[in-house]
């Protein structure tokens, strides 16, 4: 291949993976690399790179770094994954009488958008901050069941909860309702998560409608059980399991 050179890049869709790939490539390129986001996405890469010796700047939605910097070894502790915590949080929110506490969860603000959505849906949530790990905040979550209500998730909500949308769909099958728009990126994950999610929840007896950039779950029908194909996608597998509980 040819030598890499720095670029100024604005991703056409909000994608932390694309942003991270460009930044990491920029370390091996000549000159400066700048990634400018129209919508903020998870920022683990920007927080982690300085721990490994990389100098970068962040301002007004732009992340800049100079190529040729060498990474240095570091000992780090990885916080508990917020997306994995979301499954237990949804289970607690869905089942009457539930009261679940999760410790040492990563509370990076770009990863916990699902918590405010759960609260809007009716869950009762308490957050206790702990000692940060490096530049990553951590803490404990307490989630209790509450009366579930209809939830509207729009384009502004999606980047902070993109991976948790399938399990939030599962929550809506337990009551309330859910409408998601502006989430076309779901079609380009490990599977077409919109089509596969809708098909799977329908297979379990759910009242679900597919849209070009989202879906709608009408919580007016109790699931009857059935077969749901997760299409080899772990997030869909977790969503279908959560829909089936209770």
PLM segments and residue spans:
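Structural preference for solvent-exposed beta-strand-turn elements
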Residues: 1-246
């Amino acid at each position: 291949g040819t030598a890499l050179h720095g670029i100024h890049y604005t991703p056409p869709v909000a994608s932390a993976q694309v942003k991270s790939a460009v930044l990491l490539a920029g370390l091996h390129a000549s000159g400066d690399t700048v990634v400018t986001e129209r919508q903020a996405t998870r920022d683990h890469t920007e927080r982690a790179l300085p721990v490994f010796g990389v100098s970068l700047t962040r301002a007004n939605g732009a992340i800049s770094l100079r190529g040729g910097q060498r990474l240095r070894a570091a000992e780090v502790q990885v916080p508990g994954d917020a997306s994995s915590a979301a499954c237990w949080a949804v289970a607690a929110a869905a089942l009457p009488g539930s009261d679940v506490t999760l410790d040492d969860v990563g509370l990076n603000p770009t990863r916990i958008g699902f918590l405010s959505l759960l609260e809007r849906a009716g869950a009762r949530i308490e957050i206790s901050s702990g000692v940060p790990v490096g530049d990553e905040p951590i803490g404990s979550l307490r989630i209790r069941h509450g009366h579930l209500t209809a939830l509207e998730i729009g384009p502004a909500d999606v980047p902070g909860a993109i991976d948790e949308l399938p399990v939030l769909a599962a929550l809506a099958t337990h009551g309330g309702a859910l409408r998601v728009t502006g989430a076309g990126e779901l079609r380009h994950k490990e599977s077409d998560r919109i089509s596969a999610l809708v098909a799977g929840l329908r297979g379990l007896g759910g009242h679900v409608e597919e849209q070009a950039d989202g879906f709608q779950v009408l919580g007016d029908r109790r699931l009857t059980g059935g077969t749901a194909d997760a299409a080899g996608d772990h997030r869909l597998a977790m969503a279908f399991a959560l829909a089936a509980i209770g």
